[in-house]
C-alpha cells in the first residue's frame, strides 16, 4: 500500500510505500527492515562498548541472541494479549509483518530472558542491563520510523506546524470512533500528532544523555534505572496523545501509560537507594575474562584486574587484552605438592 503523507504546516507532501521489496508473492515491509536496522545498530553499539562494562563480547553474543528473539516474541504476545479476539487464526496472531508489537512487551522479554541467558553464560547482570539499555534507546529511536511507514502510532488532532495527515490516518480514525479512549474526540480529516516522531526524538535524546553519563555512573544498574525513568516519563506523556493505545479490557485505562508510571516510581526509588549506598565508594569495573575455565583452575594464582569506571575506552581494551594474555600464559601443568609436616615423636 502507498500512502500520501502530508505535513500541511511545513508544506511537505510525501509518498510512502509500505513494501520495501517483493519476492514472488512475498512482501518484505519497510516496517520490518527499519526495526531490524535499529536492532543491528543497537547490537553494534553493545559489542563495541562491552569491554567498558567488564563484559566479554563472545559470551555477550549468546545473551543478545536469546534476548532479541524473546523480545520479539514477548512484544507480540503483549500486543495480542490486549485484544485476543481481534485475530481470526493462529497465523494472524504470529504474523508481525504488518505491525502489531508492543515495546513494553519487548523490554520485559529482553530483560527477563536476557537475565536468564546472562546467568547461563556467566555475564555480570547489572552491567549487562546498563549496556543494553543504551542499545534499547538506539533501537527504539530508529524503530519508531517503522510506525511512520505503516502510518500508525499517531495521536489526536493538532494545529502545530508538524501536524500530519494521510489517507491512512483518516481511515483509521473513522474506523475507531466508538473505541477511542475515554474523553478522546478526533476529526479524521484533520492533521494529527506524529507521536512516533516524538518518541523517536525522546529516545535518541535519552541515548545521548545516558551515553555521555555512563563513565560517571556511581553503581552498577544506574544506567538501566535511568533508562526506565527516562523512557517511562516520555512514554507516559506521549501515550496520552495517542489514539491507538492498548487498553486494559473495558476499563478504558491505557496499558502502556500505567506500566510507564509504575516503572518510573519503582526505578526512581531504587535510584535513590543505589545512590545512597554508593556514596563515597568509587565504582571499579572488573575486567572481562575470556577463559573462565582456566580462571577457575588457576584459583588464587589469578585475580582479574579492575579499572575505575571513568577510564577511557582504549585503556579498557588494552588492559583487558593484557590481563587475558597473562592468563593464557599462566602455566597450570605443574602439580603443586602439599608439604606435610612429619609429626614429632
What are these model-predicted stretches?
Residues 1-345:
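A feature for loop-to-transmembrane-helix boundaries and adjacent hydrophobic helices
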